[in-house]
């Protein structure tokens, strides 16, 4: 807080967390990403166990359909194309939120916490994991530079920041293509995969 960071947080008992998650997809999704930071790790493990028991495979279809409907509504709102001149790296089609949605669905279906667990289960291939990880790292890198250069939580790659971010990420001019063109081409290739 002292640094000006916005931190999403809540304090709940295990029973409250599970109960609220039944009716609120946002809470349920955020609890999928919960992780132990400090305190009694046994309490956290108990929470994870209770959460997974409450939201087992019998609730999976409902969760997947809701997340896909959420994604479709977001895509429609953002123009339903990944090829916009000033893309939204978080909410745009093929962007960070789409990667997160895929992983949330996989976490829900397979009760995993790590992408590599999906490789071990045979759900993903080595190539899938590499593509996903490369895309995720790219988006987070771009997003961090975007927030830093904008001095705020900005998600759109506007024209006035595309050149600066391309320089920060070492996209140099080459014969036939400026660095910013190479950067945006890479962005669109990542969103396509």
Where are these regions (language model features)?
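A nucleotide- and high-energy phosphate-metabolite-utilizing enzyme signature
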Residues: 1-193
């Amino acid at each position: 807080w002292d640094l000006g960071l916005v931190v999403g947080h809540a304090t709940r008992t295990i029973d409250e967390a599970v109960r609220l998650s039944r009716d609120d997809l946002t809470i349920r999704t955020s609890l999928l990403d919960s992780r132990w930071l400090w305190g009694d790790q046994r309490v956290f493990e108990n929470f994870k166990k209770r959460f997974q028991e409450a939201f087992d495979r019998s609730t999976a279809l409902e969760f997947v359909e809701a997340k896909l409907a959420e994604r479709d509504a977001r895509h429609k709102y953002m123009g339903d194309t990944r090829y916009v001149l000033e893309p939204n790296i978080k909410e745009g089609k093929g962007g960070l939120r789409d990667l997160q949605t895929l992983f949330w669905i996989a976490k829900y279906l397979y009760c995993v916490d790590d992408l590599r667990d999906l490789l071990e289960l045979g759900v993903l291939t080595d190539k899938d994991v590499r593509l996903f990880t490369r895309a995720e790292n790219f988006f987070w890198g771009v997003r961090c530079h975007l927030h830093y250069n904008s001095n705020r939580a900005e998600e759109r790659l506007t024209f006035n920041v595309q050149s600066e971010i391309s320089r920060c990420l070492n996209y140099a001019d080459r014969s036939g293509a400026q660095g910013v063109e190479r950067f945006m081409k890479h962005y669109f290739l990542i969103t396509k995969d």
